[in-house]
């Protein structure tokens, strides 16, 4: 599940209504598909122009990521921090200005190439997590 980029604001500090809606969504999915694994993907970086005309990460983004991470923990579902995968603070501008570009000039949305890049990073994270799980599990399966 990846929702929330458009609720982020420059001064956003309280995302309780968003979280309440997401909790309801996650709970409905758990009831409808009890065997399904659920992954919450955080919002990515989103830039805005300061009064001085400089591009900066919108202050509400990191706060929203924290809310999303807490939601995943509270609901016992997986979480992937796309903001950090993008490169964290200021990464949207880097993606826009990459050659070839990985994001749109609205400094909000990734493009197809950016999506493909991030999908690769998510895939690598999932494979790494599975490998770590298998290694830990091997210790429990050994006989003393």
Residue ranges, per PLM feature:
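Active-site segments of SGNH/GDSL-like serine hydrolases
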Residues: 2-6, 28-63
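Generic, well-ordered alpha-helical scaffold segments in large soluble proteins
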Residues: 25-28, 32, 71, 125
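Catalytic His-Asp segment of secreted/periplasmic serine-dependent ester chemistry enzymes
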Residues: 45-144
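The substrate-binding groove and active-site-proximal loops of carbohydrate-active enzymes
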Residues: 4-19, 52-57, 106-109
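Cell-envelope and extracellular/periplasmic
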Residues: 1-16, 23, 43, 71-73, ...
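Generic structural signal for well-ordered alpha-helices
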Residues: 22-27, 65
